[in-house]
């Protein structure tokens, strides 16, 4: 082993286990606050490397998303403290188990928006009662009628499942407080799992809610009225693309509105949600919609993309704004629509655009200087005049040891058409290579579109399997066929596919458990009002 890697491994292992031990000890102290594992849209928008983390060990305390992933990635298969039992056999992929559950909800998620999953205890086996997944629906609710914020527990149900035969509705609420109010961005969770924060989007305003749920309240067709705080943060503009980002260390949320402004809200989960004063809100891109923001807590910068094609950096202490041009605005596709991905240990930020005037691109920026480090080309994109939306990439497990050991994977298009392709790029040091290391046409259809990617390393499947989950919107079965699908990819070209009409929403992943049905993914269909759970291995 490289001595530098060995040092980094030992240093980070010490930090991870001390952090976990401190958390557990704190839970045994007087009147502790329970801390579980929230998994939402933001989990994979933070990158880090083990070698880099050894130089910034405080980040594992300040940014719980790092701790959650470190616990998953850097442990022995079948480790008891991390969901241990017996590793799954190599034949599990073809075991013939029945498909997991799906539920008709009466609403759906917007494209590239995510459910949120909560795991009650990271140091114990999965919990049938304590673990849940929640969906915020893009439809108005009715108290006593249709629900638009729905959660399920007994998640690990199905053939041979840990939690019996079927999932259970944990709660179902109508969160609509004004005519037409719905949830069109992704919800976020408190660390103890008792509260859910989200935006109610209206035609001309946006309301930030923090809801405290109670088990057993409401059903899918008999929604309960929730207990929640409400703050109208954008009184004159809607919010349709900018999901909230929570900084757990300061109990602060950052989020955007469709007028191109970014807002700061304090006291989110542990106090009273309050709009921060000057320099907030920060005007980023007047009249252009924003992506979800992502915080680099190491440098103190908030990164956000805009439909005008620019990547922006906000100094959270002063409100000072810096700009890097990534793509073009106008035409058939917005400039940037997926939230940036930020490496907090290597000081880099990644953003995707379907059109920079020449092609679709993945741009890597130096976060501190806001200069371009690298630009990878992803095919024609929307440069030919056809509407194309390109979403977030995902990074191989090797990247989290050292960027030079990993790759970035994502969808683009053909070089001279709009057929969906997958691309992979390696790294030299921390810098992305511009020459593709692997590319492959996914479908011959020019009408099918690709979703964003979610990566998950499961150490208990076949000795360690790096999964990539994404989807295609149509033509998965045959060109001209309407059916979309969700894909599980291992390696470069080993696919497992299952039908999801319209393709999947954003995808969240739960565990690396060996218990029955307890290593799964959660999503909704883009053209059908169903919530789905599939196993990671085999999409069953």
Named regions from a protein language model:
Residues 27-29, 34-35, 40-49, 63-67, ...:
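Mobile, glycine-rich extracellular loop/lid and propeptide segments
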